[in-house]
A protein has these predicted regions:
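Extracellular beta-strand-rich, repetitive "passenger/adhesive" scaffolds
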Residues: 1-21, 37-42, 61-71, 88-92, ...
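Extracellular beta-strand/beta-solenoid scaffold signature
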Residues: 1-8, 22-31, 44-54, 67-83, ...
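Short "repeat-start/strand-capping" segments in structured domains, especially the N-termini
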Residues: 12, 33-37, 54-58, 83-87, ...
Length: 278
């Protein structure tokens, strides 16, 4: 592979002396029908590791360490928009306001076996971000990813917004704390808004002890979804195990487990309930 390190980019001398990077600093940029296999590369000191628009990409076994410099909200590990095809696997990514982000896809995506380590305090950051993802027969697959979020403050492990036909299986999300990065509020392991015809199964969300004492920390939260199956998911030490808002019609919950939650399951919408354990 190729190492991409210590990019300087088009920044002014004053900003350079201050250690700031240009917001467009990108390790690899793909645009318009590009096809690329990106494997075993190293990305350090870049605002975005890989950025792609309307292209095909296989991104495997890369290392990315995205700096926690201002503006944090502009940083990305892998940022994919309107892909022709996407396969993202076995990457190690430190930080990035969005660690892996895919938007505008109808061709089917695979995100699997990635390790994401996060220690950001900027609100609404997400490890894996999915936006406007469509498909057929559950051809979007996100599985076996491991996320560690330290000192979460309104952080999301896996965020879904306007997503259909997704199989979200066997992901592990751990919320941790240290003395300089204590447990915060309003964190979510898995968050879904307008998610439809999807299967969310066997995901494990765990918080260190203080996360269960902080209001609105939640394992799984779903809003305005439809025709989703959520089963065999397990949450531990979160203030809420699972929460459901809006219609969530034809949604089935079964065999989920909520350990050490202030409230295991909170429903503000009709769902079909199977056996749960709290």
């Amino acid at each position: 592979g190729t190492d991409f390190e210590n990019f300087v980019g088009s920044v002014s001398k004053i900003a350079l002396l201050g250690g700031h990077l240009d917001v467009n600093q990108t390790g690899i940029l793909l645009y318009g029908n590009a096809t690329c296999h990106i494997e075993q590369d190293t990305f350090r000191n870049v605002m975005k590791g890989v950025r792609s628009t309307r292209s095909s990409q296989i991104i495997v076994d890369n290392f990315m360490n995205i700096p926690t410099l201002s503006p944090i909200e502009a940083t990305r590990g892998i940022d994919i928009d309107q892909p022709v095809s996407t396969y993202i696997a076995e990457n190690t990514i430190f930080n990035g306001y969005l660690g892996i982000s895919v938007s505008g896809s109808s061709a089917g995506i695979v995100i699997r076996d990635n390790d994401l380590y996060r220690s950001l305090t900027a609100g609404n950051n997400a490890g894996i971000n999915l936006y406007r993802i469509y498909g057929v027969s559950l051809n979007n697959r996100v599985h076996d990813n491991e996320l560690e979020i330290t000192g979460g403050q309104r952080a999301v492990g896996i965020s879904m917004n306007n997503v259909q036909e997704l199989s979200l299986i066997h992901n592990t999300i751990d919320f941790l704390q240290t003395e300089p990065l204590p447990a915060g509020y309003e964190n979510a392991g898995i968050s879904g808004l307008d998610v439809r015809n999807s299967r969310i199964r066997s995901n494990y969300i765990t918080g260190s002890s203080h996360y269960s004492l902080r209001e609105d920390n939640v394992g799984i939260i779903m809003t305005n979804g439809m025709a989703n199956d959520l089963f065999c998911n397990e949450t531990t030490n979160m203030y809420f195990g699972q929460r459901y808002f809006g219609p969530n019609m034809v949604t089935v919950l079964r065999e989920n487990k909520f350990y050490d939650a202030f409230r295991g399951l909170e429903l503000f919408s009709p769902v079909s309930l199977g056996k749960q354990e709290h």
